[in-house]
Amino acid sequence: MSKLFWAMLSFITRLPVPRRWSQGLDFEHYSRGIITFPLIGLLLGAISGLVFMVLQAWCGVPLAALFSVLVLALMTGGFHLDGLADTCDGVFSARSRDCMLEIMRDSRLGTHGGLALIFVVLAKILVLSELALRGEPSLASLAAACAVSRGTAALLMYRHRYAREEGLGNVFIGKIDGRQTCVTLGLAAIFAAVLLPGMHGVAAMVVTMVAIFILGQLLKRTLGGQTGDTLGAAIELGELVFLLALL
């Protein structure tokens, strides 16, 4: 289990992980690592939340929110933001399904992708600032948001098909079963409930689950399945929806 956690931490983040900690784990077994996604999200959110808390007293709420969002993006290497941009470039191109998938492969940033990045990053900064001004616990909110967003991404993997013939997303999409999905969602719910008591966290998670489920169905109808890019988009949008639900 520990090897699986370190392998997933190295796979979906840019945090330094010694290779020997995950050595011996076959790539084809990575799908079992979905249950570690909420824990990894918890770690990322906690680090981002600590940055917010430290900077808030020094430079104020807006700049603290800006740098916490920046740190979160740096820790993931912009991996999920890139997926969001590619997904929006493809889906909003109004082309055929094959053309959409080809556009999503293009490394160049399009208008729709650029707008999506600006909107999501700016929205996160504004929502975090508003939560802090309302007296909500910033560290707990960020940690829960990151845990829940990565946990609910399982909804785009379970009983979905991979829209392409190859790619990194193929490790998870269509490869996880109902038990793994329930465990992943259960862990995310526990983290949300513990970090944000009084049912606020659980209620926000329910809203996020509904939003991500609907997103998954829309993407399935549009693209014929999911890709690594759509998983990244789901994680980014999941974070934002969860934080919005806390307002």
Curated annotation (Swiss-Prot):
Keyword Magnesium listed: yes
Top-level taxonomic group: Bacteria
InterPro entries for this protein: CobS
Membrane topology: Multi-pass membrane protein
Enzyme type, top EC level: transferase
Transmembrane segments: 34-54, 59-79, 113-133, 194-214
Gene Ontology cellular component annotations, sorted alphabetically: plasma membrane
Subcellular location, record wording: Cell inner membrane
Reaction(s) catalysed by this chain's protein: alpha-ribazole + adenosylcob(III)inamide-GDP = adenosylcob(III)alamin + GMP + H(+); alpha-ribazole 5'-phosphate + adenosylcob(III)inamide-GDP = adenosylcob(III)alamin 5'-phosphate + GMP + H(+)
One GO process term, biological-process aspect: cobalamin biosynthetic process
Single GO MF descriptor: cobalamin 5'-phosphate synthase activity
Cofactor(s) the protein requires to work: Mg(2+)
UniProt function note: Joins adenosylcobinamide-GDP and alpha-ribazole to generate adenosylcobalamin (Ado-cobalamin). Also synthesizes adenosylcobalamin 5'-phosphate from adenosylcobinamide-GDP and alpha-ribazole 5'-phosphate.
Record family assignment: Belongs to the CobS family.
Protein name as it appears in the record: Adenosylcobinamide-GDP ribazoletransferase
Record lineage: Bacteria, Pseudomonadati, Pseudomonadota, Gammaproteobacteria, Enterobacterales
Annotated gene: cobS
